[in-house]
């Protein structure tokens, strides 16, 4: 049997991390078994579904590189198919027309709740033989079995049973002729030959209804696996107050897709004590029986740690392709300065996100208007004039511009003046970067370049002279 899974989001908002994890688990399960992964857009909620949300979902899937083998399918383009199946069910007696008004149903609901009963349809039209005009408004309901129970072996939670007496006759077509969500899902899974449905635990109560409809259609019933919810680190349901929840917001905040995928796969699944997984390892090791039944807690610090790991572990040339987007957001012109891959090597240890890296690299490419006030006050003092002049001349004399030769020039300045490296290094750092912190000074000066470094040292010397004149 060919394994076939699906990810079926509703386009009423962005792709959130819970949906992304569900997509990842479905994708991994299919890939682990050499099967196929289907993308289906469940856009039956015409009022809330938007083109922007569809685009956001596709962007998120593409950014995570969760490629699909079929689709994307859109439910709104399959209404003829759904209605054909409903008409067939009406002929076979597994569905019936219901003419009950909203007022009657609301009164029934209030009466049942007043008695402490669970609100449900009372099957009035199921047993009615009244004649109705063809154009009289009605819904179509599924004639749910009234005896027995529905049992399915959830691949994460084990056997789950529902009594059919707990399930009322579900509306499968509205008065406007549009099919409902639970029915469309069933026909889609049947037509698309889905073998395994991996989805959130909020769908557990839909499962017995969908199984009963599948059985009424004499269609194969897929295997179900319901993944637990994701909570914030305070144990409450993950929401915006815990930080970003949109996949693309993590992109915007400077995370690599590899880091987010690695974090999401471990958010409810484990393989021994291993924490770091390549995509190939995820595919190789992923199984549903290793997915936890318990809710997972989202820990941003752990994700940040993983992101820092991947910034330094992945090839710099690859990381640079993602960094480029953030550089563009900062409006930095990188034509005159180090290659982005070299920048990744330079700043990787210091920066935990690509956004942070982009925001801290401007001085490599563009001259700064002024020095950091605190750093200048501390290090650009008259005592720094001689070290800056000497190191400037030694840097100017370098014919082979390498980080090693830059280091020798700084060391030679300290030796010549008989001062510690800090007496040369700190004024030089402020002079060439405008701030008091940077990566190792030799590689920083090398990356900034000979001409630009000397120009900035001269600017710092002028700054010192100007301050002296003001005193």
UniProtKB/Swiss-Prot annotation:
BP GO terms, sorted: glutamyl-tRNA aminoacylation
Residue sites binding Zn(2+) per the record: 98, 100, 125, 127
Known cofactor(s): Zn(2+)
Enzyme class: ligase
Reaction(s) this enzyme catalyzes, per UniProt: tRNA(Glu) + L-glutamate + ATP = L-glutamyl-tRNA(Glu) + AMP + diphosphate
Cofactor note: Binds 1 zinc ion per subunit.
Pfam families (UniProt xref): Anticodon_2, tRNA-synt_1c
Positions of short motif 'KMSKS' region: 237-241
An MF annotation (GO) of this entry: glutamate-tRNA ligase activity
PROSITE patterns, A to Z: AA_TRNA_LIGASE_I
Described purpose of this protein according to its UniProt entry: Catalyzes the attachment of glutamate to tRNA(Glu) in a two-step reaction: glutamate is first activated by ATP to form Glu-AMP and then transferred to the acceptor end of tRNA(Glu).
Subunit (UniProt): Monomer.
HAMAP family given in the database record: Glu_tRNA_synth_type1 (MF_00022)
Similarity comment: family membership: Belongs to the class-I aminoacyl-tRNA synthetase family. Glutamate--tRNA ligase type 1 subfamily.
NCBIfam families: gltX_bact
Protein name, per record: Glutamate--tRNA ligase
């Amino acid at each position: 049997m060919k394994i076939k899974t699906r990810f079926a989001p509703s386009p009423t908002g962005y792709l959130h991390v819970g949906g992304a994890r569900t997509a990842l688990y479905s994708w991994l399960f299919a890939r682990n078994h050499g099967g196929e992964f289907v993308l289906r857009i469940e856009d039956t909620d015409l009022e809330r579904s938007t083109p922007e949300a569809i685009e956001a979902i596709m962007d998120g899937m593409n950014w995570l590189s969760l490629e699909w083998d079929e689709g994307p399918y859109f439910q709104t383009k399959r209404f003829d198919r759904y209605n054909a199946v409903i008409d067939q069910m009406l002929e076979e007696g597994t569905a019936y027309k219901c003419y009950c008004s909203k007022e009657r149903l609301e009164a029934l609901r209030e009466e049942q709740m007043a008695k402490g009963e669970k609100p449900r349809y009372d099957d009035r039209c199921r047993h009615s033989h009244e004649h109705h005009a063809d154009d009289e408004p009605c819904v179509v309901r599924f004639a749910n079995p009234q005896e027995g129970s529905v049992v399915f072996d959830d691949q994460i939670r084990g056997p789950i049973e529902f009594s059919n007496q707990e399930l009322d006759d579900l509306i499968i077509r509205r008065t406007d002729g549009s099919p409902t969500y639970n029915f469309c899902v069933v026909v889609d899974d049947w037509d698309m030959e889905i073998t395994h449905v991996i989805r959130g635990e909020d769908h557990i109560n839909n499962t017995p209804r969908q199984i009963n409809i599948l059985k009424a259609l004499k269609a194969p019933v897929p295997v179900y696996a319901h993944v637990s919810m994701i909570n914030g680190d305070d144990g409450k349901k993950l929401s915006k107050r815990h930080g970003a929840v949109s996949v693309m917001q993590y992109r915007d905040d400077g995370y690599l897709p590899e880091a987010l995928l690695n974090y999401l796969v471990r958010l409810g699944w484990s393989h021994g004590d291993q924490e770091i997984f390549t995509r190939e390892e995820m595919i190789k090791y992923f199984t549903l029986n290793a997915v936890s039944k318990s809710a997972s807690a989202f820990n941003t610090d752990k994700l940040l740690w993983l992101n820092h790991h991947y910034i330094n572990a992945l090839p710099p040339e690859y990381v640079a392709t993602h960094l480029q987007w953030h550089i563009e957001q900062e409006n930095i012109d990188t034509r005159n300065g180090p290659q982005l891959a070299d920048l990744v090597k330079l700043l990787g240890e210091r920066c935990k996100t690509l956004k942070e890296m982009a925001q801290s690299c401007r001085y490599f490419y563009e001259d700064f208007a002024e020095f950091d006030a605190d750093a200048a006050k501390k290090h650009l003092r008259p005592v720094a004039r001689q070290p800056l002049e000497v190191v400037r001349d030694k840097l100017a004399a370098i014919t082979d511009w390498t980080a090693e030769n830059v280091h020798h020039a700084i060391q030679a300045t300290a030796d010549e003046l008989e001062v510690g490296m800090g007496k040369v290094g700190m004024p030089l750092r402020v002079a060439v970067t405008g701030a008091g912190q940077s990566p190792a000074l030799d590689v920083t000066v090398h990356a900034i370049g000979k001409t630009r470094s000397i120009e900035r040292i001269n600017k710092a010397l002028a700054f010192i002279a100007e301050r002296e004149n003001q005193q």
